[in-house]
């Protein structure tokens, strides 16, 4: 009974959510589109002609926004473990980003192109146990940063969903070593109860031979 009540409350909150209604009206696949749109409005992160990688892309809300903003001269490579309906001119790679094979597919799709921006809305399936969820979340963050370090052009940017908790402070310090400017963003479309924030790092300095994160 309690579970049914909880499910009912979640569904009611979901369909009463103004951003869910806006997404349906505006033709976006998820309310997450408005998180990126709000950051874009403030920071002018995405520009026409850019090459962008979108991690944790499904169902495609961020890819829809990014594809529109980069235009026909831009290039977008998106990836997720889940299926995603196709979006015109978007290269989609389905698979588990923690696996080397998927990383290699992304790198192959990038080729010799230098990437202007890496964005990541990845999150693990949450158990509700911080001792379990935080290491999983931070591992995904570390892998996303590893990819950014491999593909970003000098001066490139990185936007990633993060969660406050164990491991975050060290991660934040690591990013500050690699980028000129690091800021935190909490879009109004992010639910108040959610611990998620977005870390925006601008002006990639380069790894300078620093060791990549070991993938396993």
Swiss-Prot record:
Catalytic activity: uridine(2552) in 23S rRNA + S-adenosyl-L-methionine = 2'-O-methyluridine(2552) in 23S rRNA + S-adenosyl-L-homocysteine + H(+)
InterPro entries: RNA_methyltr_RlmE, RNA_MeTrfase_FtsJ_dom, rRNA-MeTfrase_E, SAM-dependent_MTases_sf
Annotated keywords: Cytoplasm, Methyltransferase, rRNA processing, S-adenosyl-L-methionine, Transferase
Gene Ontology MF, one: rRNA (uridine-2'-O-)-methyltransferase activity
EC number: 2.1.1.166
Job of this protein: Specifically methylates the uridine in position 2552 of 23S rRNA at the 2'-O position of the ribose in the fully assembled 50S ribosomal subunit.
Name used for this protein in its record: Ribosomal RNA large subunit methyltransferase E
UniProt cross-references to SUPFAM superfamilies, sorted A to Z: S-adenosyl-L-methionine-dependent methyltransferases
Positions annotated to bind S-adenosyl-L-methionine: 60, 62, 80, 96, 121
Family indicated by similarity: Belongs to the class I-like SAM-binding methyltransferase superfamily. RNA methyltransferase RlmE family.
Record's subcellular location: Cytoplasm
Matches recorded under HAMAP family: RNA_methyltr_E
Superkingdom to which the source organism belongs: Bacteria
Active site: 161 (proton acceptor)
Residue stretches in coiled coil: none
One Pfam family in the UniProt entry: FtsJ
GO cellular component: cytoplasm
